[in-house]
UniProtKB/Swiss-Prot annotation:
InterPro entries: aa-tRNA-synth_II/BPL/LPL, Ala-tRNA-lgiase_IIc, Ala-tRNA-ligase_IIc_anticod-bd, Ala-tRNA-synth_IIc_core, Ala-tRNA-synth_IIc_N, Ala-tRNA_ligase, Ala_tRNA_ligase_euk/bac, DHHA1_dom. It catalyses: tRNA(Ala) + L-alanine + ATP = L-alanyl-tRNA(Ala) + AMP + diphosphate. PANTHER family: ALANINE--TRNA LIGASE, CYTOPLASMIC, ALANYL-TRNA SYNTHETASE. One of its GO terms (cellular component) is cytosol. One of its GO terms (molecular function) is catalytic activity, acting on a protein. Its cofactor is Zn(2+). Consists of three domains; the N-terminal catalytic domain, the editing domain and the C-terminal C-Ala domain. The editing domain removes incorrectly charged amino acids, while the C-Ala domain, along with tRNA(Ala), serves as a bridge to cooperatively bring together the editing and aminoacylation centers thus stimulating deacylation of misacylated tRNAs. The lineage of its organism: Bacteria, Bacillati, Bacillota, Bacilli, Lactobacillales. This is Alanine--tRNA ligase. Belongs to the class-II aminoacyl-tRNA synthetase family. Catalyzes the attachment of alanine to tRNA(Ala) in a two-step reaction: alanine is first activated by ATP to form Ala-AMP and then transferred to the acceptor end of tRNA(Ala). Also edits incorrectly charged Ser-tRNA(Ala) and Gly-tRNA(Ala) via its editing domain. CDD domains: AlaRS_core (cd00673). It comes from Streptococcus pyogenes serotype M2 (strain MGAS10270).
């Protein structure tokens, strides 16, 4: 077996499959594009769904890739085991309706065992297979695999909901009896026992059925096009081929671990407690790649995952004695390790480091807050005479403040308290159940549509015309091809068309189809790309249509021009964002409609009003500069030399279209555009908002809609000016400010009067002092306007020694408000209010010295006041 670096393994994999006629699919962005079922790209096949379900036909049905992936369903185990990771690389080879079982197994065995390639010893390889899949068993035998090395496993059948499914065959490497101390042998595989002896290095999925949850597996129908989907973990292959005990002791992780050794002054012990080193090395890889791909730490979705990974890594750094910010210093090492195939980490190093460091600094402040919260919890336990920290409180520290359980346990035990582990596990399970319930169930490839996939007739989109005559090539009605149609809805393909198919954020054209008499025979309501790329017109049929007949196709010109204004403005906006807030503000999605444009981009904070003003000004400057817009068709490399920006998540063919707006913007784009920027007329941003962690959205309007937006603002300003009696529009702001100042003065004066009235009323309330159990208390119903007045009473009460405890109740509207304040350690206000509040059908809580509650039963106020003597 060859001893190869991880980069050599990756390259050899790709080279082998290229030698078998495969094209190399570049690694896609970790943030999924147009797939709401996935939080992250989590496998090599995740980006190829469109090929497997037949919605798009690839240029080459044989594909290979090395795909960066993230899985976060088992974060707690990362660092504890030899092979758990958050980010990993999946090497794959795929056949879309081309070769199948025989070639997949034979070529896979060749790659693994040939001296020209990986040169694995054959006697170290074991294969599992689905018991009913005799064809795979026989093919392995034909390759020279001993029957004793083939293990039937009932679970070797891959399916996720409806869509492509089939048996799979897995390949394992036997590391020998040294990793099997109990000498269990092949039972480890047959009974699926967790072990370190047999390492799964490759899974070959034979996708041959259309899974249907409504019928038994034996009744699944064969796919019209059978597929191959395989995945081999680079980290596992590297561990095996480099003779490493764990994945972490390979060249993918050890350089990071060595840097952590320098930062911590600690030494990594392969046989000792090395969990913190592993956690840091794993998590900084995931953080570096995810942030580089546009995801940012936050409080939900992907952002929450990244924040959790970073905080977990920071806490493990503290366990190693690293108390300052340090994770950002590891980004360079991650980039250097992966540079040969993933140069983007080094290219975006400054931005990634900035985000990681800023998040570390924020977490440092959070840790201080968490420590304060833990101190309060321990003080409360002491006051209540308890000896155990409850699981729900431990979970809050873990979930809200990022405190690992072991840190909470250590600090609590140092203070002499026990830990409620079972309560913590219960709270954790509740959260996991909620998270699972919230996940969009997905991942299914979707059923293949043989009718659409079978469209092979050529069709060409004509950019520079709004109307043309063309022959009707294909009619599909009720999912069947037909020669003619006279009513209902149908799908049409023409030899050529002026109708733009929805793509790249630009909506489809609409319009009409006319016969040779000039009569409208169909209304075009949508246009989408067929699996083989032809524009597929969805039409409402008004009269007879037949294949082979020529028709006149007319798009809605006014609508197209409105869409083009927004699309061209989107390019200007993208460039302006780069100039004003930074090049990290890359496109994360767009929509160019007739009425507006919507642009999503990566950014770590809200765009300020001043920045929005600069962006809007810059876009309008380019409109007024009347920049010529040109389009050029060329190859990707030439386009990049021209400075063209390749958009987020897009895949480009051999020939690309470059749209250049003067010297201001150059982008790869297949959409339609104006001839000159001046045709946009006017650009106005109407909204900026966050739509998820690290992603902002701008909604803007152009042309007529921009004019309407400005006119509506002017009308509103005129109305305000009239209301405040401003002589001119320019005076309205000053008049509003003057009114605001007057209102503030009145409010201040009113508050002072209320305070004086409350103080006067308090004098009467504070005279009625009672005593019970040696505690002096005041219990009274007061007439106040809001709960804030109760706090004012309490503040006045604290100034003098009226009593030890104060209980105030007020009926405000339909609600009852209760306040308890205490100056004595013998009475805990928070605990006392928990006893009193239920009397008025309420609940509440608070600190030892002050607590408040709300209730709904005002008829029980007297009963509550009478109960005070019993509860002090």
């Amino acid at each position: 077996m060859k001893e190869l670096s991880s980069a050599q393994i990756r390259q050899m994999w790709l080279d082998f499959w290229k030698s078998k006629g495969h094209c190399v699919e570049p690694s896609a962005n970790l943030v999924p594009v147009n797939d709401p079922t996935l939080l992250w790209i989590n496998s090599g096949v995740a980006t190829l769904k469109k090929y497997f379900d037949g919605s798009v036909i690839p240029e080459n049905p044989r594909i290979t890739n090395a795909q960066k992936s993230i899985r976060t369903n088992d974060i707690e185990n990362v660092g504890k085991t030899a092979r758990h990771h958050t980010m990993f690389e999946m090497l794959g080879n795929f056949s879309i309706g081309d070769y199948f079982r025989d070639e997949a197994i034979e070529w896979g065995f060749e790659l693994l065992t040939s001296p020209e390639w990986f040169d694995f010893p054959k006697d170290k390889l074991y294969m599992t297979y689905y018991p009913d899949d005799k064809d795979s068993y026989n093919r392995w035998i034909a390759c020279g695999v001993e029957p004793s090395h083939l293990v039937p496993i009932e679970d070797n059948f891959w399916e996720i909901g409806a869509g492509p499914s089939g048996p799979d065959t897995e390949i394992f490497f036997d590391r020998g009896e040294d990793f099997d101390p109990e000498n269990i042998g092949l039972r480890l595989l047959a009974e699926d026992i967790e072990n370190d002896r047999y390492i799964e290095i490759w899974n070959i999925v034979l996708s041959q059925f259309n899974a249907d949850p409504a019928v038994p597996r034996s009744e699944y129908k064969e796919l019209p096009n059978k597929n191959i989907d395989t995945g081999a973990g680079l980290e596992r292959l590297a561990a095996v081929m480099q003779g490493a005990k764990t994945n972490f002791e390979t060249d993918l992780f050890m350089p990071i671990i060595r840097e952590v050794e320098k930062l911590s002054g600690k030494t990594y012990d392969p046989d000792g407690d090395n969990m913190s080193f592993k956690v840091i090395a794993d998590h900084i890889r995931a953080l570096s790649f995810a942030i580089g791909d546009g995801a940012l730490p936050g409080n939900e979705g992907r952002g929450y995952v990244l924040r959790r990974l970073l905080r977990r890594a920071v806490m493990h750094g503290r366990r190693l004695g690293i108390n300052e910010t340090f994770l950002y210093k590891l980004v360079l090492t991650v980039g250097q390790i992966m540079e040969s195939y993933y140069p983007e980490v080094l290219e975006k190093r400054d931005f990634i480091e900035k985000i990681v460091k800023r998040e570390e600094e924020t977490f440092a402040r959070t840790i201080d807050a968490g420590s304060g919260h833990l101190d309060s919890l321990l003080a409360q336990l002491k006051a209540e005479g308890k000896d155990t920290l409850e699981g729900k409180d431990i979970f809050k520290l873990y979930d809200t403040y990022g405190f690992p359980v072991e840190l909470t346990e250590e600090l609590a035990e140092d203070a002499g308290y026990k830990i409620d582990h079972e309560g913590f596990k219960s709270a954790m399970k509740e959260q996991q159940d909620r998270a699972r319930a919230a996940v969009v169930k997905g991942g299914s490839m979707g059923m293949q549509n043989e009718t659409l996939a079978g469209i092979v007739e050529e069709s060409r989109f004509e950019y520079d015309t709004y109307s043309l005559e063309s022959s009707l090539s294909v009619i599909i009605a009720d999912n069947e091809r037909t020669e003619a149609v006279s009513e209902g809805q149908a799908l049409l393909v023409f030899a050529q068309t002026p109708f733009y198919a929805e793509m790249g954020g630009q909506v489809a054209d609409t319009g009409r189809i006319k016969n040779d008499k000039g009569d409208t025979v169909a209304e075009v309501v949508d246009v989408q790309k067929a699996p083989n790329g032809q524009p597929l017109h969805t039409v409402n049929v008004l009269a007879s249509l037949s294949v082979g007949t020529n028709y006149t196709l007319e798009i809605n010109k006014e609508r197209r021009l409105a869409v083009e204004k927004n699309h061209t403005a989107t390019h200007l906006l993208h460039a302006a964002l780069h100039n004003v807030i930074g090049e990290h503000a890359t496109q994360a999605g767009s929509l160019n409609e007739e009425e507006f444009l919507r642009f999503d981009f990566t950014h770590f904070e809200a765009v300020s009003n001043e920045e929005l003003r600069h962006i809007e000004q810059e876009v309008n400057e380019q409109i007024w500069n009347a920049l010529t817009i040109t389009t050029t068709e060329t190859d990707v490399e030439t386009a990049k030399e021209m400075g063209a920006m390749a958009l987020f998540g897009e895949k480009y063919g051999k020939v690309v279209r470059v749209v250049q707006i003067g010297n201001y913007s150059v982008e790869l784009c297949g959409g339609t555009h104006l001839n000159n920027s001046s045709e946009i007329g006017l650009f106005k941003i109407v909204k900026e908002e966050g739509i998820g962690s690290g992603t902002r959205r701008i909604i803007a309007v152009t042309g007529r809609q921009a004019f309407e937006a400005y006119r509506n603002q002017e009308d509103a300003l005129k109305e305000i000016a009239a209301t405040v009696k401003a002589p001119q529009l320019k005076d309205a702001a000053a008049k509003v400010q003057a009114l605001s100042d007057s209102l503030r003065d009145f409010q201040k004066e009113n508050a002072e009067l209320k305070e004086k009235a409350a103080a006067a009323a308090a004098g009467d309330v504070f005279k009625d002092v009672q005593e019970a159990k040696g505690v002096r208390f005041i219990a009274s119903q007061v007439d106040v306007a809001d709960a804030g007045a109760l706090r004012t009473f309490a503040d006045n009460w604290k100034q003098k020694d009226y009593s030890d405890v104060l209980v105030l109740v007020a009926a405000i509207g339909e609600k009852v408000n209760v306040l308890v304040a205490s100056k004595t350690k013998d009475v805990h206000a928070g605990n006392m209010i928990k006893e009193l509040a239920p009397i008025v059908a309420g609940r509440g809580g608070g600190k030892p010295d002050m607590a408040m509650a709300g209730g709904s039963d005002a008829s029980k106020i007297a009963e509550l006041l009478a109960a005070v003597a019993e509860t002090v």
